[in-house]
Amino acid sequence: KIISEDNFYVFLDEVQNVPGFQRAVDSLYIKKNVDVYITGSNAYLLSGELATLLSGRYIEIKMLPLSFKEYVSAFDNNNYQQLFLDYMRNGGMPGNINILKSNVNDLDKYLDGIFSTIVYKDIMARNNITDKLLLESVIKYIFDSIGSPISIKKISDTLTSKGISTSNHTVENYITALLESFLIYKAERFDVKGKNLLARDYKYYVVDSGLRSYLLGKKADSDMGHILENIVYLELLRRGYKVYVGKVDDLEVDFVAENRDGLRYYQVALTVRDEKVLERELRSLQKTGDHYPKTLLTLDMDLETDYDGIKKINVVDWLLSDE
């Protein structure tokens, strides 16, 4: 109980695990000399009764692992290209920094702790999920398919063919739990010309490439293009955009980023040194039919280039910029 007239700052972490916490938070909030900060690792925090009690009276700040710009600020090394390759592999969880500076062999232990907490406490315990094998199989499938359009039926059929019994309904419930725990994110498909959302074959992205590397092992390194895409997706979220996958006729724009200023289009590729690859990556951006900014992001070390209004930028430079 606070009876003093002094100013107080109250920090509550994972308070959703305490029965009746909503009323306690509300009683603190109504005091003029108290600022309340609530942190949590899943979407349940602002669901239900608390959202009703605090409706219109709170600001939600969504947090993600370290951006590449934040990551490099912790190192004296200014070889950004090498640091970026490390970032692609190890991810941006804050604890990575000290581990990479001291004993890199401890990295998997650290990531295992994070993964176990999310899966066993935030997901299994809260959702009364008992089939650990099935849940981990769904997670591995999505982690292995980042940046590719997938359906619930496709996941269910694939797992069933491997002898893991499940149903579309169960897979859908598991994916909902993964989304609410912020382990994965869903990018809906956006019809660029019709300016409307399409209701199938979403793409999913993982919250941290290091967690993906931990879970998939060496297999994780076989798809660097989609890892790069995943990093760009998360960076667009950090910059305050709603992010969709664009459809233009029979072509695809990797990302349509939307904010109050309008749209931006992004295409992501490891390299476009091959002329045919360059033409392919530019084609979907050229067909959008509007004048919103269009950017092609690659790992190529060339100088920034302009192709009739489409900017080609090195992705490391873009990540370090304030666009």
Where are these regions (language model features)?
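Conserved P-loop NTPase "ATPase switch" module shared by AAA+ and STAND
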Residues: 4-21
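Structural recognition of the conserved hydrophobic beta-strand(s) that form the central parallel beta-sheet
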Residues: 11, 35-41, 62
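Conserved catalytic/switch belt of AAA+ P-loop NTPases
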Residues: 22-38, 51-52
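Interdomain motor-coupling "hinge/lid" segment immediately C-terminal to the ATP-binding subdomain
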Residues: 41-43, 47-149, 185
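Accessory nucleic acid-recognition modules appended to NTPase machines
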Residues: 103-263
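Nucleic-acid nuclease catalytic cores
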Residues: 248, 290-309
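Active-site ExK catalytic segment of metal-dependent nucleases
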Residues: 262-273
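Domain-level recognition of nuclease-like catalytic cores that cleave nucleotide substrates
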Residues: 301-323
